[in-house]
């Protein structure tokens, strides 16, 4: 969600702060700002909208100073205006914040009664006023920081400047991530290591409850009680990452076309392509012995988990309990300490998923993390980490991370089946051989379907509602297709199990309703054809995504039929996701929306 950066050193910082913010644009934001201390005075520039607006403001009114903090805001409390943009100032204090202060209304009333005058609608401003109050009460800077942290409740990552200390940034973490970067004669602060990659690859991650005093030559870290603590310094792999679209119009387009390569890379970590066997990955979770598996995630990662559920239950005969992370821990699920749980998150920082992970840890379950960021909080708090190895994904709408999550879950399910004795050695080899073929087939599909997709997308861009249908693993895929379309084109779309058509959605069908049916010629195909006939009988405009055999067998008039290669069931979700991604992408391009940073969305949702 929001992005935080800070630099303290001997060189001017404002331009470098903005460059660091650009590396956090993928998180989503609606306003931005920078504050520095120059000649003993706090100064700031803020702007609504994209970073180009802030850059324009800085060209008109440059900021000097060798210490500064900066922020991209994703609105939670208060409208996305310049007035509500961070940094927030009170007397002698500048604050940037990612998160939600849950008791801000109570604190605001208390501070206002004491004479504080609030200038914004944000929850963050109470932090600045608390710090000013404690300084007026005679507390030193560190004492004021510690006292403030004792008062605020909720999730926060904070960076603070005190006007009377032009050589120190203070920071705190409780929930959203914060990374401290170590330089030579300068230090850095960022919401993640990607922001700091141009400056340093030596990173220290704060953990929940930590707060830090960062100077030019080092950092002092304290726990919530004020005790000095040590946190390990590590080398980040984010340093190799460059924000570059290459020859593509958008990051999303680039990431769609990267999928054959990144999936081949990911699978190489989990299977032996020569012997067509799965590779043992972790001793921490024994899939051969666990009686059941829980899966929790949000958004697209949750839909990947739903598909994974089919695989674990079919190939490993392993019962799976799955729910969206925001609901998971409130259901009071009876959990067995002998069971295991998988948590799926691209960023590894998703707040609801992390909370569900901690809920399962409290109940004694073994924890596995299916993440893209191996240095993330979810990864660090898990017993086993299953990296998806997708590389940085900048587009807010997930594409390559989704298919890499599926590839990893498929490999884990086959490995679990082998460990449980529910698939034979020959079946294991056949399944792994199918997985090994997947990158080649994905490349073939991406090179062949674009013209048809573009033509169809032009028509879809004129629609107001779209229905997606599927059975088996194509049902979660239908939900994913609908999610992609609504995320980036802002067209209302819903994904349903095809068998549920008669239980409500059929009431929406008329000659204006496109119905996208995902129907490989599998064991569900005949039933899905029956559903298509019901749509056709009511004048619905059918868009069929199937394979050669399905196209020949359907015998239905369709608005469009997209024909894909015939593939094994275990790789069908990854192959059939490609036209869904391209359909959403090109429709959004025709609609003229901000494809990579769609309105109101954030890449990494770090608050509940």
UniProtKB/Swiss-Prot annotation:
Domain named Glutamine amidotransferase type-2: residues: 2-217
Source taxonomy: Bacteria, Pseudomonadati, Pseudomonadota, Alphaproteobacteria, Hyphomicrobiales
Cytoplasm in keyword set: yes
PANTHER family: GLUCOSAMINE--FRUCTOSE-6-PHOSPHATE AMINOTRANSFERASE, ISOMERIZING (PTHR10937), GLUTAMINE--FRUCTOSE-6-PHOSPHATE TRANSAMINASE (ISOMERIZING) (PTHR10937:SF0)
Highest taxon of the lineage: Bacteria
InterPro entries per UniProt: GATase_2_dom (IPR017932), GFAT (IPR005855), GFAT_N (IPR047084), GlmS/AgaS_SIS (IPR035466), GlmS/FrlB_SIS (IPR035490), Ntn_hydrolases_N (IPR029055), SIS_dom (IPR001347), SIS_dom_sf (IPR046348)
Active site: 2, 603
Organism: Rhizobium meliloti (strain 1021)
GO terms of biological process kind: carbohydrate metabolic process; fructose 6-phosphate metabolic process; protein N-linked glycosylation; UDP-N-acetylglucosamine metabolic process
Protein name from the UniProt record: Glutamine--fructose-6-phosphate aminotransferase [isomerizing]
């Amino acid at each position: 969600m929001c992005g935080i950066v800070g630099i303290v050193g001997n060189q001017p910082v404002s331009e470098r702060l903005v460059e660091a913010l650009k590396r956090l644009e993928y998180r989503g934001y609606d306003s931005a700002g920078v504050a520095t201390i120059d000649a003993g005075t706090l100064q700031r520039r803020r702007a609504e909208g994209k970073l180009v607006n802030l850059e324009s403001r800085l060209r008109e009114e440059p900021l000097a100073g060798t210490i500064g903090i900066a922020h991209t805001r994703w609105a939670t409390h208060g409208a996305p205006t310049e007035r509500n943009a961070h940094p927030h100032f009170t007397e002698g204090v500048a604050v940037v914040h990612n998160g939600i202060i849950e008791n801000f209304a109570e604190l605001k009333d208390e501070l206002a009664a004491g004479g504080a005058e609030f200038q914004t609608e944000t929850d963050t401003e109470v932090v600045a006023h608390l710090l000013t109050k404690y300084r007026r009460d005679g507390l030193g800077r560190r004492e004021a920081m510690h006292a403030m942290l004792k008062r605020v409740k909720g999730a926060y990552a904070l960076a603070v400047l005190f006007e009377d200390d032009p050589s120190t940034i203070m920071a705190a973490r409780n929930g959203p991530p914060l990374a401290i970067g170590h330089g030579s004669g300068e230090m850095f602060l960022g919401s993640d290591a990607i922001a700091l990659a141009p400056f340093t690859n030596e990173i220290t991650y704060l953990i929940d409850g930590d707060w830090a005093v960062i100077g030019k030559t080092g950092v002092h870290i304290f726990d919530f009680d004020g005790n000095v603590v040590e946190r390990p310094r590590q080398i980040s792999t984010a340093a190799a990452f460059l924000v570059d679209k290459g020859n593509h119009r958008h990051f999303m387009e680039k990431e769609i076309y990267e999928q054959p390569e990144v999936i081949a890379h990911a699978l190489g970590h989990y299977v032996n392509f020569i012997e067509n066997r799965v590779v043992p990955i972790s001793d921490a979770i024994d899939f051969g012995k666990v009686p059941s598996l829980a899966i929790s995630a949000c958004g697209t990662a949750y839909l990947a988990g739903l598909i994974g559920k089919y695989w674990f239950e079919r190939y490993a005969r392993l019962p799976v309990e799955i729910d969206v992370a925001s609901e998971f821990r409130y259901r009071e699920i009876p959990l067995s300490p002998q069971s295991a749980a998988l948590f799926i998150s691209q960023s590894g920082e998703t707040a609801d998923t992390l909370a569900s992970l901690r809920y399962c840890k409290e109940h004694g379950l073994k924890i596995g993390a299916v993440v893209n960021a191996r240095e993330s909080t979810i990864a660090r708090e898990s017993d086993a980490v299953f990296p998806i190895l997708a590389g940085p994904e900048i587009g807010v709408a997930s594409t390559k991370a989704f298919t890499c999550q599926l590839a990893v879950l498929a490999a884990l399910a086959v490995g679990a089946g082998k460990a449980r004795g529910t698939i034979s050695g020959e079946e294991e080899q056949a399944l792994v051989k199918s997985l090994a073929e997947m990158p080649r087939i994905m490349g073939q599909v991406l090179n062949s379907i674009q013209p048809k997709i573009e033509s169809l997308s032009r028509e879809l861009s004129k629609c107001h509602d779209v229905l997606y249908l599927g059975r088996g693993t194509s049902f979660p895929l239908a939900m994913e297709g609908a999610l992609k379309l609504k995320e980036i084109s802002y067209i209302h779309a819903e994904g349903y199990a095809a068998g549920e058509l008669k239980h409500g959605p059929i009431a929406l069908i008329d000659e204006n309703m496109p119905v996208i049916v995902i129907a490989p010629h599998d064991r569900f195909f005949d039933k899905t054809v029956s559903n298509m006939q019901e749509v056709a009988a009511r004048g619905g405009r059918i868009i069929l995504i199937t394979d050669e055999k399905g196209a020949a067998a359907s015998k239905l008039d369709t608005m469009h039929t997209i024909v894909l290669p015939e593939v094994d069931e275990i790789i069908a979700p990854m192959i059939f996701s490609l036209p869904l991604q391209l359909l959403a992408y090109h429709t959004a391009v025709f609609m003229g929306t901000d494809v990579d940073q769609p309105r109101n969305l954030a890449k990494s949702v770090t608050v509940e």
